[in-house]
Structure formats: C-alpha cells, structure tokens
Amino acid sequence: MFKVSKYRHTVGKIDKRELWYPDVNTTGNSSASTFIKANSKWVALNWQSNTGTIGLIPLKSFGKRKGETFLIHAHSSGVIDFEFNPFNEHQLVTASDDSTIKVWNIDEAIRSGATSLSSASIVCSGHSKSVECIAFNPVANNILASCSADKTLKIWDLSNGEEKYSWNFEQGSLTSLSWNYDGSLLVATGKDLKNRIIDARTGESIQVGDGNQGVKASRVVWLGNLNHFLTAGFSKMRERQLVLWSSQDLSKPIKSITLDSSTGIISPIYDQDAQLLFISGSGDSSVRVFDMNTQFTKDPAFTELSPVPSDTPSKGICALPKRALDVMEVEIDRIFKATPNNIIPITFNMSRKSKSTFADDLFPNTASTKPSLSSIDWLSGENKQPILVSLNPSDNQINNDLDDLQLNDNEPVKKSTFFIDDNTNDNSNVVEQSKSEPEQQQQEEKKISSSSSSSSPTNSSSNVINSTPSSPIVNDNIQRTGIVPKVVRSSKYRHISGSAHQKSQFYTNLKINGSTSNTCIAVNSEYVAVPMVGIGGPLAVIPLADKGRQIQVPCIEIGSQLCDYDLSQHNTSLVATGSEDSHVKVFKIPTGGIPKTTANKSNNYTTTEADFVGHNRKVISVNFHPTAENVLITSGGDMVVKLWDLNEGGAGEKLSFANVHTDMITSVDVNWTGDKILTSSKDKKMRIFDPRTNKGGLASETVTHSGSKGGKAVWLGQTGNIFSVGFNKSSEREYQLWDSRNLQSGTPLASDKLDHLSGVITPFYDEDSGVIYLAGKGDSSIRMFEINDQEPYVHYLTQFSAGTPQVGVAKFAKKTSMDVKKCEIARFYRSTDSTIEPLSMTVPRNRQEFFQDDIYPDTRQTCTPVMTSEEWFDGCIREPEFVSMKPSDMINLSDAPPPPKKEDKFVVSQEVDNTPSRDQVTNSLLSRVSNQNASSNWEQIEKLKHNFTDYDNGDISDSEWD
C-alpha cells in the first residue's frame, strides 16, 4: 500500500478576472514586510507609497468598485506590518517606522458612515525604533507580541494598551515572530542569524541555534500543532532557501531546499489544517506549494506540489481563513496575491466524484473566532488549546454576510459610499432604505429563485441581500472555476507543457562553473558543453549519447579563464572559445569525443585549429554564424564586434566595428537570412548592423531598457521583429517587442514587466511555433510566451518549474530530431551546479498516431550551411532551406480519416406481461376476505377454496385468465 498524502492532488488556479479586486494602489515601501492580509470579512492592503495608509475592501466586493476605498490613515511613516485580530474580525492592528503600534476598530467607523479612519482606539508607544513585526496570540484574547529595531521583544495587552513584558536581545534585533499552537512559546529569527525558541511569559531563550546565514532578513512560521517550524531566508551564497527545524533541537536543520538566486524576501503561509505551505517572494510571479504532512512520517514530508504560475510579479500574499472557503466545492485554500494594480485570488481545489456531501476527511475542525483564554488568564500562566469549529455547513451555520455588525434598531444607519459595488447597472439590485421589509423580502426571494442552479450552497446563501443599505451589492453567481476569460484567445499552444526527462537521461557528477560571463551551456546535435570548475578554464564537451553518471569528464583546456564559447551547428566537431587573455580559439573534437583522462594524469585536450588575437581586452561573446559556414562573430571588452573567417587560419579577421558601442556588449544575434547582426549593450541601446556595407555597418539603433544591467535581444524569424529582455530603472525585469523596420520611433510594439528577480534572462525563439522561452540565470523556471499579430502581440502561455536553480539553459536547434510522435515541439538542456537535465516541451493532442502538420510546418535546416564563408563575405544573400519533419511512416492529421464515432447503445424493448398469475389472484382474494372478518367467515373461505380448487382441476382454461 502506497503511503501518500491525501492532499497530493491539490491544484491551484488563478480565479477569473471577475473575481479579482482591481484598481488598488500598493505601497512602494521596500521596508514593508506585509503587503496584504485578509479575514472572512475584509481584505486589507498596504496602500500607496510610504504614506502609512491601509486600504480596506469588503471580502465580497470583488470586481469593479464604485465610490472610494475605505482608508485607514494609520501612521505618519510607512506601515511595516499589520494584522487582523483573530477574535475580532473588525479590529486591525498596525506597526510602523514611527515606532508605534495602533489598534483600529473598523465597526465604529462603519456605523458612522465614514469612508476613512484616522483616530486609533489604542496607541502603544513602548518601542524606541521601528517595529519590525507583530503577532497575535492564537488562544488568548488581546495578547500581542512585537519586535523592534531597538532589539526588544514586547508583549502587550490590547484590552487597555498596556505593555506587560519587555526583553532585550543585545545580540541583534529580531525580524520575525511566530507563536506555537497553544500560544505559550514564540519562535523568532534575528539579524544575528540565530533562531530562538522563547518563553513568551519569561523572555527566556529555551533554544538558540544558527539560522539562515544570508545577510537579508528571514521569515519564520510555526507549523501548527507540530514541534517544527520553518524559516525562509538566504544562504551565504545569497540563494533563497527554505529550512525545516525541530523546536526541540536547533543545532542542525532537518531539511533544507535551495530555491533560486532571487533577491525578493519570501512570505511563508502555512495551513495547519491541511498541512500545506505556500510561498511567494517579493517580485515572484508564481506561488509554490509544499506538502508538510506527517501522516506517515515523524517529520513533515516537505515535498513540492504543482506551483501556480502567472505573468504578474507579486508584492505579497496572504491566506483566507478556512471559515470563508467554499467547502462544498472542495476549496482547500484561497491565496490572495497582491500586485501593483490588482489583488488576484488563487484557489486550491481537489477533484471529487460528488460534491453533494461535505468532505469531512479533507476539512478537519478549524480554529474559531472564540478565544480559549482571556488576557488575564494567559498572563497568569494558564495554557489551553484553541477552540475548534466544524466547517460542515449542516453542523455549524457559518455566517457569510459581509457585514454582521449588530446595530441597534433605534440607531440610524448612514450610507457608506465605499460599500457600493457596480458589478451591475440594474437599479433593481439596489435595495432602497424607504422600502418596507416585506417588499425587500419579496425581492430577495426573487433573486434567490433566479440564481443559477449550479451554484454551490455557500454561494447561494450569500445571494440574500441585507436590509441595511450599507451592505454591498455583489454578484455571487460567479463560480470559482479558475481562469475563464470573457473571450478565450484561440491558440494551438495554449496548453503547452514542459517536463524533464527521466533521471537516467541526466548527465550527473559534474562540477559546473556558473561564473562565466555569458554562456553556461551549449548544445548541438552531437555534443553538450559546460564550463567546469578548475584551473586553465576547462570546458567539458560530452557526447549526447554518454548519459548518466560521468566518472571521467573529458575537457578542453583553454589556458586562461573562460569567458564564452559556442558549438557549431554545421560542423558539430568545432568548438570556439573566448577567454580573459583576449584569445579566440577554435578546437576540433576528435571522432568519438575528447579522450578520457587516464589515471594519475590529466590529459585535457589542448590542440587548437586556430588561435585568433584581435581584441584588446577579454572576449565577451563568441557566436557561430547560423547560415554561413565557418564564420565566427565575437565581441570584446574593448566594445568592438569582429567577424572571422575560419578558413583562413590565423589571418581570419575580416570585419570589425569599433567606435559604435559606448559600453560592454551583452548579446549578439543574426537574422534568419544571415545578413544583419543585432547587438544589445549596457549603454541601454540596441543596434542593427549590416556588416557588409561600406557605411560603417550601423543600420539603425534605439534606446531600450533603462536598467544598468543591460539586456539581451533576439530576432523573431521571418517576421522582422525583435524581442528584448532587460531591466528598468526599478531593477524589475521586463520585455519589449520591436519592429526592426521602425526602430527610430523609439517606441516598442509591446512591453511589460516580468518580476523583481536579479538573474539575467536569455530568450530563445522557436520560429516554427512563434513561442519564445525566457530562462533566467539563477531561476528555477522557464517562461513561455506566444508572439503573433494579435494585440497585445505577446501572450503569456505558462511556465515550466524545476524546483532547483539553473546555471544556464540551451535550446536544441535540430528540429528534425524532435519526437513528433509525442508532439514534442522544443527541447532544452538545463544545467545546475552538478547536473545537465534534458527538458521537452510538448503540446497535448488526442490523435498522436497521426503527424500533427498544423503544429509542425516545414522547418529550417540548421545543420547544413546555406553558403560558404567566401560567398557570405562577398555579399551573397540566400534564404535557408526548409525540410519536412514528417516521418515516412506517419499520415498527416489533415489527411487522416475522421475519428470513428462511438456506437450508440440500442436498448431492446421487451414486453413484460404484468397479468397476475392464478396463484397471485387466489392469495389476494383469500387475504382480502380474511382481513374483513376472519372470525365469522370461515365457511365462505372454505367455499372459495373449494371453487378455486375446481378451477385448478381444469374447469377454466389458462387462456381465459386476463
């Protein structure tokens, strides 16, 4: 019997846009640790830029809102952290740079009809520096913990705003706090890179141990009723990591997972009922999920489930309480993702055969809004478990109304404009205050009866509109079934998916050097090459057939630090390298590959076919020409582009373009006919060269990305367009689509932000499908976009997530080697610190026995040169040859016969004779008579028996019975 978690099939989907919260304004405060929080009534957002304002949106007011957003003008400086009171859903607590903690009672402002709030109910002013983190006790009412940059930890009683305990931590200030299940202990991380288990009443550090060793702040979360907690931070190598710890032993971690090299601080969210962990860092575009179940193991399983990708970077995430979920639709969790302009709900569901019954195996009792202890009881030393409540709607009627404030009957209710929703313009949806209660009830009944029959019980019950005009008018008929745009764009590649090959196909036991300035992996139809750790710039060139564990790795020895290299697609045995000593070398791999190293002797391959010296500084990039044979393009630190003819040995330099670039060149690419060269530079410009003209070669240029890191650009096949990726002034990664014929306009056809990660992205374009793949150095994913002539021209498809950071990615160019029988449209080789992993991008199809000619057009022949180097330098222009990818034993899908129709099942009707038999008639008559008067009619009964006996003897034939 397999021991697997029951939540392993949890699938997350982004809700359709009708359920988003648009037109929000998130803060730009980089010091803010919290951007969004939610409970079953409200969604709170760190609003605007460094204004100390919190925006409040009713949970049910999704979609376009009419009127002003309710704002809490909380602090004179930026809000760093804020929390809803778990036992009072209309109370919010904020912490700020101004060293204060404030308590806000939302219900009082709602009663008054105000649209903003600026007077706090309680102000706690015990800290002397900015408050870094606050955390409510999970069992005791009004008990709050806070830590500050003044190196103190304080415990507050918010019933009166008094400071109850205060402890100093001279080793360094604490940056993150989390309570254990019964609210007796705190786990904390600090700037001294230590983890601490602290007794919340005495301030004693029960356990102290080394935590995440990165210089950036880490976050911590206690894993419910387990004796474990998790930290999310950075390693010494500045890589983001998750670390699992036991609260009983902080000397060493139980398990750690390295994520990527992004700089965004991770926000961990833990569901203690389902034992699921959700993470997303600032600037990340995806939400990752981990199963932490302890059903079969002592320690949490810590296994990753399917992530939820998107094309929008995140500012922060939060989870909705279980009480607000649609349990009858098997909604396991709902995560809110805050972006610069929207709040995006992400629902996590599980498939069930029937949703008519409550899935009690998936929804255990959850924490209620009733405290187990008062603040006085907790301060006196008492401990209790949280009070739990059932999620079954039949056992516990959960109030789904947005505003359940208990208003006095004689108290007038003022209208708050921020509650009004314009999901519909129908005036009949607005309940006027002047209408009588019977009229309102009739309208409510009509609305309920007209609702969709497919609505879940939870959604249906929420259609009843409160009689108070302050309740929002929302359309609850919208179903949470994932992304369903109003108009679905038709595309053959919408469902493209990526998958890694089996581990037996990996190349392992490698020590890959990821510090090369440009290429970290290259591949052609015979070899894959990666730079290795070692002296002399070793470059491992491994035959593709030599899969598995590499015992002896054959290497080319450059003689200096390797900067860049390339493998020829035309002559697969040629390798070109560029190094720190400004040499450009060409090697020819012997037949069968580089000889293996022998015992006690290093036989690195050093035989060169050519050694060019032309650049005054180190060589930055090396690229073989894609259409002309033996033409090499290089760029150097001297900001010069050179073209070499490999047929002429040491005197092979043919063309040179100097005094054009004013900063380091970051990418070089050649168009599909091979006559124009595209460059990107750190001087924030993109240039097109026609290298064989007499006008200096420069054809056009434009300013692209404004960031200091520079970008990379590629030609988009026969379209004549250009796709570039880089950074903006805010260090956000972005892309731009350009028309090469109109660069002088300075305006791209399309552009958008990607995320806040720091890795340089390399774009790979597939001319046959129009799909572009974006792979960032240090990322753990590859994003896919489709580019066509439909606005906005660049359409996000999906992303492949590997779970471990990548050093580099290379695209396999030989399309005729694709496995068309599995609908493979692209293949990549992905390198990590120790492995090379092949990846396949496939399109799901039903009839894979036929050649899918709609997704496999004739492809460019990349392994055969179009012309010689002499012809190219003489100015020849020749279009590449195209070949079919169709195997000889397959039939085109367009020529295939229609699929066989399923045979209809015919039910043969049978006539059944329902005429009662003789015995049935006899017994029926006898029973009727005996029931009427059993005591006085025995003689009649005997007579009837005698008569029927005569019938049985043949006096009446069988055919006379009707």
Swiss-Prot record:
Monomer. Binds to F-actin. Residues 484-962 are annotated as: Coronin 2. Residues 1-438 are annotated as: Coronin 1. Residues 449-473 have a biased composition (Low complexity). Residues 911-936 have a biased composition (Polar residues). Its main location: cytoplasm. Belongs to the WD repeat coronin family. Keywords: Actin-binding, Cell projection, Cytoplasm, Cytoskeleton, Phagocytosis, Repeat, WD repeat. SMART domains: DUF1899, DUF1900, WD40. Residues 417-478, 910-936 are annotated as: Disordered. It is found in: Cytoplasm; Cell projection; Cytoplasm, Cytoskeleton; Cytoplasm, Cell cortex. It comes from Dictyostelium discoideum (Social amoeba). This is Coronin-B. WD repeats lie at residues 74-114, 126-166, 169-208, 212-255, 260-300, 557-597, 614-654, 660-699, 717-748, 755-795. Disruption phenotype: Shows altered chemotaxis and phagocytosis. Cells are slightly smaller, grow more slowly and do not reach the same final density at stationary phase. Affects the infection process by the pathogen L.pneumophila and allows a more efficient internalization of bacteria. Allows a more efficient uptake of dead yeast cells. Involved in phagocytosis and cell motility. Binds to actin filaments and protects them against depolymerization. PROSITE patterns: WD_REPEATS_1, WD_REPEATS_2, WD_REPEATS_REGION. The gene is corB. The keyword Repeat applies.
